[in-house]
Amino acid sequence: MWKYILAAMTLSTPVMADESKITKGYNSMDAMGCMLVRECKNDVDEVFSLLDISSQYDNTEEFTSVAAEFNTMLMAMNQIGIKVFLADQRYFPIMHRGVYHTVSNNVYLNKRYMNQPHILMQLMRHEGWHAAQDCMAGTIDNSMIAIIKPEDDVPMIWRVMAERTYPSHSVPWEAEAQWAGRTENMTMEALQACARGSMWTEYKPTPLTYKWLKENNYVD
């Protein structure tokens, strides 16, 4: 029953990363796994502000319009205990643009695709929404996520897109993350609620999520 509201994400030296642990080559799930568990750190740089990303590209000034929302999301993530990294494309499967890892509680963005502000924001909002889903499931210190919005609230376009893109068991979480990824401030507000410790008062848990939270002593 819980698979419909909660899911477990399957999902070096100081100078050099231990990339010898990558046994199946770059651009593989193996390479991404090495990055996610922080055994591969070379060309995986923590982001402290939007400038750490925008300065990597020739069109730096084009990012100005998204600076406030990006930096506010980043600040909320840091308050929660989540870090954001800009990583070389070799650590990602082909066409994979970013990931939130529920175990390490970090977001990784693929440097290959972050050169356009609108793409960066879609990814930051999308992966940030998964972080908020992690918060909704009790705490980021477990590996569970829960949907934040009632499924009927998600616009059909994002539901259909998720059904065409993700395995069926992931659709509830991915549909609302698709929605958040393309909605200004939606993720920012959810992350701020999490940082304030008011996730379950600002976003009413679904009945099954509430049951889970109560059974695990997260709510009275």
Mark where each language-model region is.
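Sec-dependent N-terminal signal peptides
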Residues: 4-12
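Boundary at the C-terminal end of the N-terminal hydrophobic targeting segment
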Residues: 15-17
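Short N-terminal segments immediately surrounding and downstream of signal-peptide cleavage
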Residues: 19-38
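Auxiliary, metal-adjacent structural segments of Zn-dependent hydrolase domains
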Residues: 35-103
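A mature extracytoplasmic/lumenal domain signature
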Residues: 88-90, 111-114, 135-138
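Short pre-active-site segment immediately N-terminal to the catalytic Zn-binding motif
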Residues: 108-123
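Catalytic Zn2+-binding segment of zinc metalloproteases
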Residues: 128-145
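Metalloprotease/metallohydrolase-associated module, dominated by Zn2+-dependent proteases
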Residues: 144-220
